[in-house]
């Protein structure tokens, strides 16, 4: 684009080209993002050709198509994050081939579109899986899955292929759908067990039946998610220009040596912009409740797009387990003590998180300070006291507290409102007392457990 004048020196040429690319970066960002959407759409549609229900060899055409579809849509959650958890998401899922009803809310769901049916008013939360395949003895089982009207699938919840979640039902966080369900039932855990549930009452105009003015307002806020897309592209151009400038004034070796410094600077910029966006769009977050069709939800989603689309690729993922991530999370509002080890940036509402001295949050953990049942976001604090440990890929729900020196094992779920006593060991989904690694039973009382 726009080649420099022949008499310009190498460094001047880099500067001129970079300036022109930065000026065009909004257009470049739009074309880049739409191209990615088109590639994902065409790929998934082509992969769906010939997929049929039944058992297929893992090493077969259908087996490869199903596997590849899930891999593409898993990657799309990162590459196309701004269009998820938006008014456009149901349309996107329909374009991919899923049967999606009206007034559906969907976040970063991974699904096999040609085998998915979602009823009117259903809610698919973050990182859910629908119509996922199962493997057994070298065979892959592929079957349709259905989410009934006004049913809810919580964060990392699953509705595997061949199963139906009946209308007005709920699958809790990190839980799976049982083989048989009845309408109006709630399920928790893996394997799932029945869960008592307190329904949240709210104005229908703020949950299921919003007026046109609220739909327009939400759309306007969601358009602001284009800002982090533009900043991501602009930062990429700036990094490329900086490396080109190093080559122009020195050699490739200089660019190789100082390239890390350039990337560190880019990461700092991305983190700083994300902190600024959080403070501008939502400010300090406090415990409470907010219906789906309210500006807090929309503003929070804009700020979260900065976190996932700008800070994550440029800073947060690479900074896992370093003091830099702790500084970033403190700037986002978290209270983190001395010597804390934090490998996960998934503290959705950091203002509501307290990590004591020497606390540990392992890789892949979610310190979940909100729940979204009945289209109302409930926010509450989560506390890990001094020396407490949350094992890899575990989730802790709002109003929970891990006592001093308490350990929660990998892949576990700490339920809402649970208080785990100091010096105890816990494991499971949901957690239960865990035998210590030295063979002694965990000395623990059963925690109090709130209804979902």
Question: What is each model feature region?
Answer:
Residues 95, 113, 160, 331, ...:
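Residue-level signal for short amphipathic helical patches enriched in basic/charged
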Residues 1-96, 184-333, 421-452:
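Terminal amphipathic alpha-helical/low-complexity segments used for targeting or macromolecular assembly
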Residues 99, 105, 111, 115-117, ...:
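Soluble catalytic regions of membrane-associated enzymes that act on cell-envelope
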Residues 83, 87, 101-106, 132-133, ...:
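Conserved short histidine dyad/triad with adjacent acidic residue
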Residues 119, 123-229, 270, 360-452:
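Glycine-rich hexapeptide-repeat left-handed beta-helix
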Residues 80, 94-97, 101, 126, ...:
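Non-catalytic C-terminal interaction regions
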Residues 30, 109, 176, 263-264, ...:
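Transmembrane helix-bundle signature of multi-pass membrane transporters/permeases
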